[in-house]
UniProtKB/Swiss-Prot annotation:
The modification N6-acetyllysine is found at K13. It comes from Sus scrofa (Pig). SUPFAM superfamilies: Thioredoxin-like (SSF52833). This is Chloride intracellular channel protein 1. GO terms for cellular component: chloride channel complex; endoplasmic reticulum; nuclear membrane; plasma membrane. Disulfide bonds join C24-C59. Its main location: nucleus.
Length: 110
């Protein structure tokens, strides 16, 4: 029996027009993680000047981006990335972590 795809929705900062995807590097990073994992997901843009009641209920006062995974709300880009790496793991989804743990600290002394 085929495994069900998780329901994933990424809420990102809208651009200056209030509708299109904005230029937030944190939103782009999470978008790329989901895309590289091969997950089907929805992207919802949030106009920071006019947050909807639904967004306020999901993540009151929360920073963008945030992730809705099923019914769970996840905030903080680094924590979201760690969560996705933990739940969307091999063999179904590729591992995105570096092969050599030392590469995570490369360049820190510059």
């Amino acid at each position: 029996m085929a495994e069900e795809q998780p329901q994933v929705e990424l809420f990102v900062k809208a651009g200056s027009d209030g509708a299109k995807i904005g230029n937030c590097p944190f939103s782009q990073r999470l978008f790329m993680v989901l895309w590289l994992k091969g997950v089907t997901f929805n992207v919802t843009t949030v106009d920071t000047k006019r947050r909807t009641e639904t967004v306020q209920k999901l993540c009151p006062g929360g920073q963008l981006p945030f992730l809705l995974y099923g019914t769970e709300v996840h905030t903080d880009t680094n924590k979201i990335e760690e969560f996705l790496e933990a739940v969307l793991c091999p063999p179904r989804y590729p591992k995105l972590a570096a092969l050599n743990p030392e590469s995570n600290t490369a360049g820190l002394d510059i």
